């Protein structure tokens, strides 16, 4: 194969050899450009567009965040720490229609027992205690037992509120 190619190369004139060499070089350069360089350049341009888009999104989010903070007027979440822990637990449980079976104060903590309660209502009540009154759940033991779906029994709930 190589002998045939060399024989053909010797059989053509010097002018044709230059023409074939220049044409082959152009084809090689074009091949490198379209197969290697062009895809890389396209990917780089696409990444630059993505970065620009993400920077614009970040700037927009920062602007909107500042607007939200300005609308809040610098007011943070207010935690009501008035009243005793027992009073807060009784009042909020009554408001959430949760029937407490027993309360037992233990120093700075409070033990609570609830016979049956909707699990979702229990979570909402505990979240409101934490968010609005700063009450923390130290220990919770919940059992489903033989209750209807969605109902649970709180065997032990230990609550505290930092002073």
UniProtKB/Swiss-Prot annotation:
Q: What domain of life does the UniProt record list for this protein's source?
A: Bacteria
Quick one: a GO cellular component term? plasma membrane
Cytoplasmic topological domain: 1-19
Task: Give the keywords, sorted.
Answer: Cell inner membrane, Cell membrane, Membrane, Protein transport, Transmembrane, Transmembrane helix, Transport
User: Topology with regard to the membrane?
Assistant: Single-pass membrane protein
Record-level GO BP terms: protein secretion by the type II secretion system
Question: Subcellular localization, per the record?
Answer: Cell inner membrane
Q: Which InterPro entries match?
A: T2SS_GspM (IPR007690), T2SS_M_periplasmic_sf (IPR023229)
Q: What is its main location?
A: membrane
Residue ranges annotated as Periplasmic topological domain: 41-163
Which residue ranges does UniProt annotate as crossing the membrane?
Answer: 20-40
Q: Family assignment?
A: Belongs to the GSP M family.
Q: What does this protein do?
A: Inner membrane component of the type II secretion system required for the energy-dependent secretion of extracellular factors such as proteases and toxins from the periplasm. Plays a role in the complex assembly and recruits ExeL resulting in a stable complex in the inner membrane. Provides thus a link between the energy-providing ExeE protein in the cytoplasm and the rest of the T2SS machinery.
Q: How does it assemble?
A: Type II secretion system is composed of four main components: the outer membrane complex, the inner membrane complex, the cytoplasmic secretion ATPase and the periplasm-spanning pseudopilus. Forms homodimers. Interacts with ExeL/GspL. Interacts with ExeE/GspE and ExeF/GspF.
Q: What is this protein called?
A: Type II secretion system protein M
**Gene that encodes it:** exeM
